[in-house]
Amino acid sequence: MMIKKQLLFLVLALLTGNIFAQITITDTDVFSIGDIAYQANDANTPFSFTVGSTGLNQSWDFSSLQESSLNTIFFISPIGTNYENQYPDANLCMDDNGLLSYFNKTSTGVFLHGVGDTVFSSPALFYPLPLTYGLNISDGPIVVIDTAITGPFLSLAIPAATVVSLSNGLANRADTARVQITNTTEFSVDASGTLTTPLGTFDVLRLKRVQTTNSV
């Protein structure tokens, strides 16, 4: 089992801009076809920043951040991309240095359908929408990958001794293995306020995302 925790208020601030009186993020505010996102990384600043407290009227000052590297992410139409035919329900594609992620964006959320030629068995919720302070929502468990592996590689990956042990001596080699990966994600908009960066000050929501991955 793997658990990942993320705080995403930086991403939301840069995607939505300073446009909120009371902060509500809908599908018209997040990325669309033709958008370009610039993702700057600071590799030199000491880890003196804190995520602060939960609640309303919070203030985060990250104005001392400096750009060490810059990544450019393009949001394009799935039509005409390498894996277009594998994602008939996708209406948005993210090109991150050639890595293509396919999404379906609706008024209730942004759903990830797969990455490259890895098509998810079920779409995974990437962002719930609309986002408002106090939102708590759970997605899953979602079966992301459910496939069978066969061939000579399997014999190398699973030694005969392991097969004998797992089968109580009924078999001495594996000819097929099933791989299943499931994700459960908890979303919580637990803070709201202003965020200051070298680009300016923005009204933001802070989205906490906890993802638990199980594989068998």
Where are these regions (language model features)?
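Conserved functional acidic sites
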Residues: 22-216
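Bacterial Sec-dependent N-terminal signal peptides
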Residues: 1-24
